[in-house]
Amino acid sequence: MSTQSFADRRSLEGVKPGVVVVGGLLALMWVLEIIDSASFHALDQLGIIARNIGSLPHILTAPWLHFGFPHLISNSVPFLILGLLTWLAGPGRWLAVTLITVVTSGLTVWLIAPSNTITLGASGLVFGYLAYLLVRGFFTRNIWEIALSVAVFFFYGSILLGVLPGASGVSWQGHLGGAIGGFIAAKFLHGSDPAIRRV
């Protein structure tokens, strides 16, 4: 036999929808990549083309598409883990972080990526979730959220170098825009949270 507090049970219940939503989005990415491969990469045209007015709506489609399975595989695990950790802040906040990051990442790519390039992939979202989780604790002053920030930095902090120009074919612009979006989301959602003071 075992016992479980109501708070623990409620916490576990809160995670289940996150697994469904975040896991469902990841499954959607895999389905789209299967369709893309079967259609000779026809869906790649839904990526962001820098400074192409007609490509602006693709800011909303590009994060869910990838240039092949190796590209998708590299994004899958961090998207799932960081997405679920962000979900723990609440479904509404997860949605806000996701939408803000999609827009800031996509606009950054559209504005400053090299001309005549197409950008796809969920890495902008990954960087958005990462930045949100890293800075949220400093706005909330919550000891557990600060501890989570430290743990996330320990495991994923090294990928922050991806916001700098580097390897050919890697969209540092999308990474930078995603990280900016994560910071903006943390400031917007938690910047007015009262600090905990001890006297």
Language model region names:
Residues S2-V199:
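A detector for small-residue-rich transmembrane helices and their helix-helix packing motifs
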